[in-house]
Amino acid sequence: PIKLVSKSIENSFCVGVYSNETQIGFARVVTDFAINAYLADVFILEEHRGKGLSKQLMDFIFEHPQLQNIKAWRLVTADAHGLYAKYGFKAPEFPERVMERKVKIW
């Protein structure tokens, strides 16, 4: 639902990628701006992939002054592992310590 999407955006550090005033990419960081950050909802529209835009988006995020003190970055992804590995992401050292809780909301 749009209401949940809007609330998630309001409570995140968001970055958009634009071409001729049209949004073609996006990423958001859920963070306390001190220790932890969760990278989420990263995308570049398919017709704009292969142009280095994902790299520019990641560079912008990881170089942003407000995000320099983050000690632990996390993400969940089904693809683009190669891109994220270039920024130091890897499988959890102790996956048995990672837990999640899902709640059906709609």
What name fits each language-model region?
Residues 16, 22-31, 38-43:
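Conserved beta-strand in the GNAT
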Residues 65:
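Hydrophobic pocket-lining residues that define ligand/cofactor binding sites across diverse proteins
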Residues 48-57:
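Conserved acetyl-CoA pyrophosphate-binding loop and the N-cap/start of the following alpha-helix
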Residues 1-14, 18:
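Active-site rim helix/loop that mediates acceptor-substrate recognition in acyltransferases
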Residues 55, 69-102:
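Conserved active-site alpha-helix within GNAT-family acetyltransferase domains
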Residues 31-39, 49, 94-95:
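A conserved beta-turn-beta hairpin within the catalytic core of GNAT-like acetyltransferases
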